[in-house]
Amino acid sequence: MLRKNERTGYLMSILKRTGHVTVSEASEMLGVSGATVRRLFAQMEESGLAIRSHGTLRSNPSGSVYSFEASSQVYSKEKQNIGRMAAMFVEDGDIIYLDCGTTVFQMTLALSQRIASGEFQSLNIVTNSLVNVQALNPDPCCQLILVGGIYNSERRDFSGPLTEKFIAPFHFNKCFLGCDGVNQRDGFSSKDVNISSLNSCVMGRSDAVYVLCDSSKLGHSSMVSYAPLDRITVIVTNAEPEADLRSALQSANVHLNLCGG
């Protein structure tokens, strides 16, 4: 039986494949009562993740538009664990770039705790995410740079040609990116054209590239590819990929870090 925090993510993966799921189907898949499923359906509709209709949960047509709030509720515990592990890769003296996704945001929260505890003497952080900036409390050791550009209120981030022009002179020891899908054929991909382009730009200025993604993204592809497998240094996730993808990652010399849960 899936844990409570995993059920929403599981149903979202079903909707992504089939477009709909009934109460009875979800009850059998999740191993919970029909009443529990109906409550879950209601919560998902209230969050804008899906639409209820006559005992069936359907994909929300507007759900193709990314929402930071809605995405934060899917695989939330897994994202927290991934974020905590990823934050441990940051070292004193680093110049890092933080992407705008919800999993990287969890990393930002964990990194903020490390900064507050006095672990760093010098740290430079560049990000296109407004929520990342808000999560990082001012500290004398930390220089924080928010890049400008076209603001997306749903994503709470900046992107576009001006953002890429701003990024161009920088050099990063490490960049930490999210993704909406990763598979052998398409590599790492995003559902947003501007973010995909920005990620490619950032990677070109980075010594090491870390991708943070929960297990629902493994084996899938999104709209725009931004990197082949061999362009990534480390992937941090919560579960083992399927054998074919794991083999492809190993062949591409991508280091796989599992946070377990």
Label every PLM stretch briefly:
Residues 2-13, 17-26, 31-36, 45-46, ...:
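Conserved phosphate- and dinucleotide-binding cores of soluble alpha/beta proteins
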Residues 2-7, 16-22, 28-30, 35-100, ...:
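HTH-adjacent hinge/linker in prokaryotic transcriptional regulators
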Residues 60-62, 101, 147, 179-180:
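Generic beta-structure capping elements
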